[in-house]
Amino acid sequence: MTGGKGKSGVAAVAQGASNSRSSKAGLTFPVGRVHRFLRNGNYAQRIGSSAPVYLASVLEYLTAEILELAGNAARDNKKSRIIPRHLQLAIRNDEELNKLLGQVTIAQGGVMPYIHQNLLPKKSGKAAV
């Protein structure tokens, strides 16, 4: 059974190439793996066929959103590689992502830069002569 032949001995190309559920849904994230995690995670007795597709698409969207913002943060810092600090800056500067991931600690992410108003130098109204 080598050479990509099935039980009948006919090549897979002749039968028609099998499409994964991810490719059918137009996703990059693995729908089959998400389905397996849902089944093995004891979240419910039964898992619908569209639930893993929906969850995989949500995970893919959130990942793309975070990576886009982190890429912008890396570019702002004149870096070509995204590091945990860029992820931290991207998430904490976005209101909705910060609310979603508010209790999440990112290792090596650092803290958000902030200087209290009272610590800033006072601006005088008169110009120095």
Curated annotation (Swiss-Prot):
N6-acetyllysine modified-residue sites: K5
Post-translational modification note: Acetylated by ESA1 to form H2AK4ac.
N5-methylglutamine sites (modified residues): Q108
GO biological process: DNA repair
Subcellular location: Nucleus; Chromosome
Domain of life: Eukaryota
Entry GO terms, CC: nucleosome; nucleus
Alphabetized GO MF terms: DNA binding; protein heterodimerization activity; structural constituent of chromatin
SMART domains according to UniProt: H2A (SM00414)
Residues the UniProt record annotates as site (Not ubiquitinated): K122
Keywords associated with the record: Acetylation, Chromosome, DNA damage, DNA repair, DNA-binding, Methylation, Nucleosome core, Nucleus
InterPro entries in the cross-refs: Histone-fold, Histone_H2A, Histone_H2A/H2B/H3, Histone_H2A_C, Histone_H2A_CS
Functional summary from the UniProt entry: Core component of nucleosome which plays a central role in DNA double strand break (DSB) repair. Nucleosomes wrap and compact DNA into chromatin, limiting DNA accessibility to the cellular machineries which require DNA as a template. Histones thereby play a central role in transcription regulation, DNA repair, DNA replication and chromosomal stability. DNA accessibility is regulated via a complex set of post-translational modifications of histones, also called histone code, and nucleosome remodeling.
Further comment found in the protein's record: In contrast to vertebrates and insects, its C-terminus is not monoubiquitinated.
Quaternary organization: The nucleosome is a histone octamer containing two molecules each of H2A, H2B, H3 and H4 assembled in one H3-H4 heterotetramer and two H2A-H2B heterodimers. The octamer wraps approximately 147 bp of DNA.
Family to which the UniProt record says this protein belongs: Belongs to the histone H2A family.
Descriptive protein name: Histone H2A.2
Gene label: HTA2
